[in-house]
């Protein structure tokens, strides 16, 4: 059976997340409809990450099995799908993979970046892709808290789901970086896998520390308490980007995140080291 790997980027603003839902527009649903029209049969496509409503992706990876009798080669299907998909979903690459490849099961890790904006807005486009916050932030405290979250821990405190059969709350964070880019703060989170809304909960916690509503010195205690009502908010979805998916452990460990390309278009200042 042929096995194709799609690499997809999308603006999640208009979508109720990745996963197909009966009464809502989703990214997976849009791909399903386009593939079914192209191959004139009911098709399925499986993604590596079930991004939530309003969350964006720079590198979503999906697995697709074309019909065995189909005469359409991958290169032609790629061109056709790029024309069929809406402008806010872009098919970046189509690759032929070994039969056993699975976009979700074979992934060894993912990297997300969350965009925060501090202070007065200079561009009307920013709220679509950022969490807008006041100017005053204690970056040093945020970085101190972030260091205490890197490693292998039970992240129940940072999950929005409880009492799920088979839930494995112990995860490994390989990185939790905070970078300044003018008025923007970029929070990059890398790990082997994540609990439901875990990245947004981590960002919400760091924001509470940065605004000095929580003490960075209490990070380990809050982490290990495994209590979801820990005095911080879940960050809103629009600032979150799935930045990279990894299928090689060495690439996960060596990955260096870059500045999200659209930041330069928003006129909010140059990068700060």
Feature roles, as predicted:
Residues 1-273:
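Structured-RNA-binding interfaces characteristic of tRNA pseudouridine synthases
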